[in-house]
């Protein structure tokens, strides 16, 4: 069975087209296989059955979507429906619950079922909408200490006269209205957001310096999402771990031919911003997309005392390196915040299980993120408390402490 790659237009997925030939499959029967040279990969459609010998399956191969082998491993299981300690979700997109008292009550019930002590709403709520949401929360006897809101920065018009002054004024007004920080600054920042003159807005653009300085003066942490996973900037081929996700979502393709900045370019701009503003507290969403290279994030922590990281939507990496992740979380226990990103209540228990148990080889909740299994990293209680709530309370003024164990 032989295959060839078909050329793909920029931003599209390359397809593999079968040109099956019976002789190759037949050569594999009887145990001989098709020989390859040392260091050479097997041809597409075949697998290495012995050193330097490849064979094609006799049965038609399923697609990556349809291959769902049953887990036959018999090991202890510890399902964790509720967090061991009340958790602050620092990456909560629950703005849709803040329209009326009924929505807020619905959110409260779902938080109770998961032992979520507080939501930090990262929906860039500002101005009159912020005032309305704060008033709704403040009027609720059960939720007034369980929801806090981040404001946003409107990047439209960066570079035009008076933009920076207006942005700083908006931050000041929003702090007065009850905002406790800024964010989530979305992935378009640095990747696609344009200045007033049409040029690409860089993350470390000096036009933005007054805003970051104002955040430091106001005591507002900046919650920032930069770029995407590094694989999203790589060629879309069958060596890419995120092939399935990239084939499903065309807006996540940033690789060669798309005209987008490179992953390393974006990370360099981001890190330069953090260094330029050492008095400003920055929280990188998704652990900065460095969970596949924890040493890189550790170096950032060592060099940048103003930096904290939130762990939303990267559980697939944390849970596949349990020993390394355990050691990293223990070493940098003061620098990591719990966060989830999309509000899907049935997915939170996977986070509790990875963080709290030492379970082996269990399913992840979203196939297109990861085709591998997860392992628990078994964090000690004192570390869990910091990750779940203490670190968020320390870096963010205005987060209540009542109801959280000390």
List the predicted regions and their residue ranges.
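C-terminal segment of classical bacterial N-terminal signal peptides
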Residues: 15-23
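Acidic (Asp/Glu)-rich catalytic clusters
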Residues: 79-82, 107-113, 132-147, 169-179, ...
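Acidic-and-aromatic substrate-binding clefts and catalytic sites of carbohydrate-active enzymes
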Residues: 95-103, 121-132, 156-165, 202, ...
């Amino acid at each position: 069975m032989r295959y060839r790659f078909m050329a793909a237009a920029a931003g599209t997925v390359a397809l593999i087209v079968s040109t099956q030939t019976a002789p190759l499959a037949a050569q594999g029967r009887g145990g001989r296989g098709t020989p390859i040279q040392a260091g050479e990969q097997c041809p597409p459609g075949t697998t290495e059955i012995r050193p330097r010998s490849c064979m094609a399956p006799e049965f038609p191969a399923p697609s990556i979507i349809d291959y769902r082998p049953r887990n036959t491993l018999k090991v202890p299981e510890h399902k964790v429906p509720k967090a061991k300690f009340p958790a602050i979700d620092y990456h909560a997109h629950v703005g849709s619950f803040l329209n009326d008292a009924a929505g807020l009550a619905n959110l409260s019930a779902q938080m109770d079922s998961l032992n979520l002590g507080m939501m930090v709403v990262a929906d860039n709520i500002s101005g009159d909408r912020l005032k309305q949401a704060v008033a709704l929360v403040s009027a609720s006897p059960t939720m007034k200490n369980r929801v806090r809101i981040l404001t946003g920065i409107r990047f439209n018009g960066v570079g035009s006269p008076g933009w920076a002054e207006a942005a700083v004024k908006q931050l000041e007004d929003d702090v007065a209205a009850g905002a406790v920080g800024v964010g989530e600054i979305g992935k378009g920042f640095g990747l696609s957001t344009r200045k007033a003159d049409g040029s690409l807005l860089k993350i470390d653009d000096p036009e933005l310096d007054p805003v970051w300085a104002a955040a430091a003066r106001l005591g507002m942490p900046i919650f920032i999402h930069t770029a995407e996973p590094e694989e999203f900037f790589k060629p879309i081929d069958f060596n890419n771990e995120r092939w399935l996700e990239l084939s499903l979502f065309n807006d996540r393709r940033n690789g060669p031919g798309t005209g987008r900045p490179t992953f390393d370019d974006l990370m360099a701009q981001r890190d330069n911003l953090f260094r330029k503003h050492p008095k400003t507290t920055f929280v990188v969403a998704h652990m900065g997309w460095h969970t596949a290279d924890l040493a890189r994030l550790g170096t950032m922590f060592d060099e940048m005392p103003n930096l904290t990281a939130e762990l939303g939507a990267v559980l697939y990496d944390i849970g596949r390196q349990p020993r390394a992740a355990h050691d990293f979380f223990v070493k940098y226990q003061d620098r990591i915040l719990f966060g989830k990103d999309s509000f899907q209540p049935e997915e939170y228990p996977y986070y509790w299980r990875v963080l709290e148990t030492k379970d082996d080889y269990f399913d992840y909740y979203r196939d297109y993120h990861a085709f591998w299994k997860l392992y628990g990293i078994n964090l000690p209680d004192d570390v869990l408390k910091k990750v779940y709530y203490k670190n968020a309370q320390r870096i963010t003024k205005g987060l209540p402490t009542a109801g959280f164990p000390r």
